[in-house]
Amino acid sequence: MEWIRKYHIAIAWMIATSAMLISLFFSEWMKLPPCDLCWYQRMAMYPLVLILGIGMYRKDPRVSMYAFPFTCIGLILSVYQITIQAFPINEMKICSVGVSCTEDYLNLFGFISIPMLSFIGFLVIIILIYIESDRETKE
């Protein structure tokens, strides 16, 4: 647990980077077109790679403050998409053009979809960015 406290921003950065690379893999190599809500979740996740990376490099204690709005927006969007996949009646108008936001391309174990992976990623990043490191508690 001590190493999580020490490297919490680096772990959050690795999760954001992995999420970015996996989403690009699905869309570019697997040719799975992302829906509008997936694009919005990407817009929340991709900047985290830079924000957390720069914050980690500069050892900025305020990096959590910079990353928090993006993680919250992404988390809300992923919860909404999980909801409309479970109950397709509530789909927004933006999801009616192009690829449907209720389309479930990946379904692991019967409940893990791409929006669920996004939700888990954003939630874990939120938890990690608010873990205080030893350096922050000593200052």
Curated annotation (Swiss-Prot):
Please list the disulfide bridges: 35-38, 95-101
Q: Name one GO molecular function term.
A: protein-disulfide reductase activity
Q: Does the keyword Iron-sulfur apply?
A: no
List the transmembrane segments: 6-25, 40-59, 66-83, 110-133
Pfam families assigned to the protein according to its UniProt record, in alphabetical order: DsbB
Name the major location.
membrane
Q: Which UniProt keywords apply?
A: Cell membrane, Chaperone, Disulfide bond, Electron transport, Membrane, Oxidoreductase, Plasmid, Redox-active center, Transmembrane, Transmembrane helix, Transport
Top-rank taxon: Bacteria
Q: Which GO terms describe its biological process?
A: protein folding
- Tagged with keyword DNA repair: no
Q: What does this protein do?
A: Required for disulfide bond formation in some proteins.
Query: What is the name of the protein in this document?
Result: Probable disulfide formation protein C 2
